[in-house]
Amino acid sequence: MSKILVFGHQNPDSDAIGSSYAFAYLAREAYGLDTEVVALGEPNEETAFVLDYFGVAAPRVITSAKAEGAEQVILTDHNEFQQSVADIAEVEVYGVVDHHRVANFETASPLYMRLEPVGSASSIVYRMFKEHGVEVPKEIAGLMLSGLISDTLLLKSPTTHPTDKVIAPELAELAGVNLEEYGLAMLKAGTNLASKSAEELIDIDAKTFELNGNNVRVAQVNTVDIAEVLERQAEIEAAIEKAIADNGYSDFVLMITDIINSNSEILAIGSNMDKVEAAFNFVLENNHAFLAGAVSRKKQVVPQLTASFSA
């Protein structure tokens, strides 16, 4: 029997990689499964900081599960097929651990599925460690903590669940770090955008959502200076136009998120700008508009777009 591949979504972030490492370890220890962690893309700068800090090698990148000889896979931090490996429909999904909406997901066989509306997939995996009485190694605790910090912007995002505020200090202690100091350093590591091309910038953390027959790409970049990113607007818009043409997106929505002040600027291009404007009750000027208090794609952008595109 081949190894069960464990991986997060395309354009992996710290939670996608952290939760997959953690669950692969738990699956071996608690369930006796033969698992291997892989990824659907290279780590971003934030995640590279995390892996280096805790001395963990980056997972190898795959583009096909079947090409790896895999018959079964476990998904963490996602379930929608368009966000997963290209041939996901051709292998058996053994299990899913996720904290997002369920959409465009169907399996031929029963599976193990753990879904909770918490701040990160890592939060769920940590609870499973405790349920099974499995000791958490320091580096695994660090990866799960990093996934939680990343997805909740150090517990400031509205996606933060009350249990996340309990879990974070526990994981910080297990990882041997100061929660606030490490969290801020980690988040700042992911805001170095100057070295990124516009094409790289709009793909750092991007997901495609099928909204009422429209393929809508929603990307997010974190920064400490929104104005600095907007100085590159012409370059970014050219990259977005190319991405739309190359991939058949109907619309492209980019969140430029200020992690210090917890606000975002929305830059949007596509065929349904009236629906984007209606979603957030704003008017786009020169293709962008300010969205006060918005830091979460999952809670403050995608549900609003979903409702607007369905109206």
UniProtKB/Swiss-Prot annotation:
Which Gene3D superfamilies does the UniProt record give?
DHHA2 domain, inorganic pyrophosphatase (n-terminal core)
- What PANTHER family does the annotation carry? BIFUNCTIONAL OLIGORIBONUCLEASE AND PAP PHOSPHATASE NRNA
Disulphide-bonded residues: none
GO cellular component labels: cytoplasm
GO MF: inorganic diphosphate phosphatase activity; manganese ion binding
From which lineage does this chain's organism come? Bacteria, Bacillati, Bacillota, Bacilli, Lactobacillales
Q: How is the cofactor bound?
A: Binds 2 manganese ions per subunit.
- List the source organism: Streptococcus sanguinis (strain SK36)
Family membership, please give it. Belongs to the PPase class C family.
Catalyses which reaction(s) = diphosphate + H2O = 2 phosphate + H(+)
Binding of Mn(2+) 1 occurs at H9, D13, D77
Record's protein name? Probable manganese-dependent inorganic pyrophosphatase
- Pfam families attached to this UniProt entry: DHH, DHHA2
Q: What is its EC number?
A: 3.6.1.1
The Swiss-Prot or TrEMBL record lists the needed cofactor(s) as:
Mn(2+)
Location within or outside the cell: Cytoplasm
State the UniProt keywords alphabetically.
Cytoplasm, Hydrolase, Manganese, Metal-binding
Question: Which residues bind Mn(2+) 2 per the record?
Answer: D15, D77, H99, D151
